[in-house]
Amino acid sequence: MSRVSDTFAETSSVYSPDHADIYDAIHSARGRDWAAEAGEVVQLVRTRLPEAQSLLDVACGTGAHLERFRAEYAKVAGLELSDAMREIAIRRVPEVPIHIGDIRDFDLGEPFDVITCLCFTAAYMRTVDDLRRVTRNMARHLAPGGVAVIEPWWFPDKFIDGFVTGAVAHHGERVISRLSHSVLEGRTSRMTVRYTVAEPTGIRDFTEFEILSLFTEDEYTAALEDAGIRAEYLPGAPNGRGLFVGIRN
């Protein structure tokens, strides 16, 4: 294995408590607007299924998108694998059920008019087969004519090898910095993210390692189509990587 592979060998896609604790603050400082992102999804759904009444947000994270979704749909639910992220979501939207589960094999036993998988969560799947498991499971939980929305990670031709970026957030009594460095290895991007948190009790830092698959547009589309979801790719918004929007046959 290469040095990069050795570093990432034990990487988990489940967010740690340290990461969950500062997630909203640092990504808000980076320009994320969850209400606006959710609003864009609502508009896309409205043009395809104006009568939609229920929505499931898989890999819902801290529940930031659910705050907007709950104002738009009669029935809203979330799904999250990380205990730390799920606990924040439960506090944020206590009236919304937040289920624990893996996006590849969860079973809620009921259909939804809309299912969203945002924040490039599908790219944490290591293989195309796992990506297809995700889309098949989404299709199983979609009502006929229901709408699926997936936000991808970068396509292989758009990824910048060696990309670095940074941000600083001032949040209450805390100052949080984030530095990241991403490299290409095979069909994946491997990102090292270093955080420093300064707070009244002192300064602490920690490092996260993230592996994200560089699936192609065709691979996402085929995974959706083969699951029985007619899909189209809409480039650009909300975060530069676009969205896949599909309707279940």
UniProtKB/Swiss-Prot annotation:
Q: Which regions form coiled coils?
A: none
Where along this sequence does the record place binding of substrate?
30, 165, 178-182, 241
Q: Known EC number(s)?
A: 2.1.1.324
Give the first-level EC class, as a single word: transferase
Is Glycoprotein set as a keyword in this record? no
Family per similarity comment: Belongs to the methyltransferase TylM1/DesVI family.
Q: Which GO terms describe its biological process?
A: methylation
Any matching Pfam family: Methyltransf_25
Keywords recorded for this protein, A-Z: Magnesium, Metal-binding, Methyltransferase, S-adenosyl-L-methionine, Transferase
List ligand-binding residues for S-adenosyl-L-methionine: 59, 80, 102-103
* CDD domains per record: AdoMet_MTases
Under catalytic activity, the entry for this protein gives: dTDP-4-amino-2,3,4,6-tetradeoxy-alpha-D-erythro-hexopyranose + 2 S-adenosyl-L-methionine = dTDP-alpha-D-forosamine + 2 S-adenosyl-L-homocysteine + 2 H(+)
Q: Which domain of life is it from?
A: Bacteria
This chain's function reads: Involved in the biosynthesis of forosamine ((4-dimethylamino)-2,3,4,6-tetradeoxy-alpha-D-threo-hexopyranose), a highly deoxygenated sugar component of several bioactive natural products such as the insecticidal spinosyns A and D.
| A single GO molecular function term of this UniProt record | methyltransferase activity
Q: Which Gene3D superfamilies match?
A: CAC2371-like domains (2.20.130.10), Vaccinia Virus protein VP39 (3.40.50.150)
What subunit structure does UniProt give? Homodimer.
Q: This chain belongs to which protein, by name?
A: dTDP-4-amino-2,3,4,6-tetradeoxy-D-glucose N,N-dimethyltransferase
Q: Gene symbol?
A: spnS
Q: According to its UniProt record, which cofactors does this protein need?
A: Mg(2+)
